[in-house]
Structure formats: structure tokens, C-alpha cells
């Protein structure tokens, strides 16, 4: 299997507490990984370190053989992340926000055209359809949308980015169970009816334990350490009960 992302001997702490410790993790191309653990177990910290936005006190993050601090902007754009804090731009409309997902692959002129609203909106509409929003939504402004709609826009922006891997920090919070499962099915089952390429590899933290059966690998964190790592078929209910 092709290694995409490696976390080697990762430990990180702040003044209040140890966040993660002794993390060794390899994510291979095509893996669908659920990251689980109770609140405060270190899931958000691990995601932040994995995408390079948080530098750990100890250890290294390797992306396709290169240290994550040394990769180009184009390579960085191949690592897609969706946060609980969605980071949408309130002053822009939905189409402009979705196209922001592709900024890493284009030049300044393309970015300017996006701000002017003159780019083709077809791909944006396809991304909206993937998250069950009507195509007319592209003309709406972010500050007019509900929390659940904003979450779907953030996921649509991630799809527009066309990353090789998706890192998600509880991306399905604020979404109803049916929609959560539909979007997860899009990522897991690779239904490429879109012109955009659906990412093959995902690492997503979850609080909806009922969704983990959709993944082929489960990682459990407890007090900042990996205590479960294996195929879902090999993890029993008593292990999950102990984890939480």
C-alpha cells in the first residue's frame, strides 16, 4: 500500500495538559479511518498536527515521503481539512466560498475572477448537489444561511478542493443523521458522478458511533494515546464501552 501521511513519535502538550503523546500512525492511500474517543481525548489536536496547522512539541509529520513543513503550496492543497470552526467568508456568496477550496491549484488571476463572481459556477452546483443543497444556493450569502447549511457549504468547498486526503474534525456535527450518512456514503463509496474527483482517503473524527461501521479502520484515542487501531470487524463492543 502507498503511504500518504505518517505521524512519527508525535507528542504535544500545552500549559494545561498533555494533548497527545507517543503517536505513531501511518495512513495509506484508500483507507477510510474513523477517529473516535470522548471529548478531550486529543482528536482535534491530532487532526491539527496531521494537516500541519499545529507544530507538535515532539515528532514529525511526513506527507508522501517529505516533511510536511517542506512541501509546496500545491502539495499542501492535496490535504483537505474540515473543522468544527468552518472558516467561511461571510461577505462572499456561496459560489465564491466553494471556489475558495480550489485556490491552492490556481493563480492570482483565477482568484480575482472568483472574487468578481465571473467564474463558471457549474462545478460549484455539482458540489452543492453532493451535499443535498439546491443549485440556486450559489447566489446566497453565508450570513443568511443556517448552521446546518453552512456546514454543508464547508463540505462542498472541501469537495471543490479535490484533495487526495480528507481530515475531518467532527464534520457531521449539526447535520441530521440521514444527511450525515449520505455525505459519508459519497466519500466512502466513491460515487464519481461528479466532474470533480472524490478523495480516496479519509481520517474523520466522530461522535456519532453509529457511523463507524462505514469505515474500514478505527482508531481510538484515550488520554492522548492510541489505544485502539484496527479493522472495525475486529473491534468489539466492550472495547468501545471502555473507550467512552
Where in this protein do the model-derived segments appear?
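Helix-to-loop junction immediately C-terminal to a conserved catalytic motif
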Residues: 51
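ABC ATPase NBD coupling module
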Residues: 67-83, 117
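Conserved ABC ATPase "signature" region
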Residues: 112-136
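Conserved ABC ATPase signature
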Residues: 141-145, 149
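Hydrophobic anchor residue at the start of the ABC signature
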Residues: 154-155
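Catalytic Walker B motif of ABC-type/P-loop ATPase nucleotide-binding domains
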Residues: 166-169
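Helix N-cap at the start of a conserved alpha-helix in ABC-type nucleotide-binding domains
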Residues: 177-179
Amino acid at each position: 500500500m502507498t503511504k500518504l501521511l505518517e505521524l512519527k513519535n508525535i507528542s504535544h502538550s500545552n500549559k494545561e495538559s498533555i494533548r497527545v503523546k507517543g503517536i505513531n500512525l501511518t495512513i495509506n492511500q484508500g483507507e477510510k479511518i474513523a477517529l473516535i474517543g470522548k471529548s478531550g481525548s486529543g482528536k482535534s489536536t491530532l487532526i491539527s498536527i496531521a494537516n500541519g496547522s499545529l507544530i507538535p512539541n515532539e515528532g514529525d509529520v511526513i506527507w508522501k515521503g517529505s516533511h510536511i513543513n517542506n512541501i509546496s503550496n500545491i502539495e499542501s492543497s492535496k490535504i483537505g481539512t474540515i473543522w468544527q470552526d468552518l472558516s467561511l467568508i461571510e461577505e462572499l456568496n456561496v459560489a465564491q466560498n466553494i471556489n475558495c477550496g480550489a485556490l491552492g491549484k490556481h493563480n492570482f488571476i483565477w482568484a480575482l475572477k472568483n472574487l468578481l463572481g465571473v467564474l463558471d459556477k457549474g462545478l460549484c452546483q455539482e458540489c452543492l448537489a453532493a451535499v443535498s443543497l439546491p443549485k440556486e444556493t450559489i447566489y446566497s450569502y453565508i450570513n443568511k444561511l443556517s448552521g446546518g447549511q453552512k456546514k454543508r457549504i464547508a463540505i462542498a468547498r472541501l469537495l471543490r478542493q479535490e484533495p487526495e486526503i480528507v481530515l475531518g474534525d467532527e464534520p457531521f456535527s449539526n447535520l441530521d443523521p440521514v444527511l450525515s450518512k449520505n455525505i459519508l456514503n459519497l466519500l466512502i463509496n466513491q460515487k464519481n458522478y461528479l466532474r470533480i474527483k472524490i478523495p480516496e482517503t479519509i481520517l474523520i473524527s466522530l461522535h456519532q458511533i453509529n457511523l463507524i461501521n462505514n469505515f474500514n479502520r478505527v482508531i481510538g484515542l484515550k488520554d492522548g494515546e492510541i489505544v485502539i487501531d484496527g479493522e472495525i470487524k475486529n473491534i468489539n463492543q466492550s472495547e468501545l464501552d471502555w473507550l467512552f
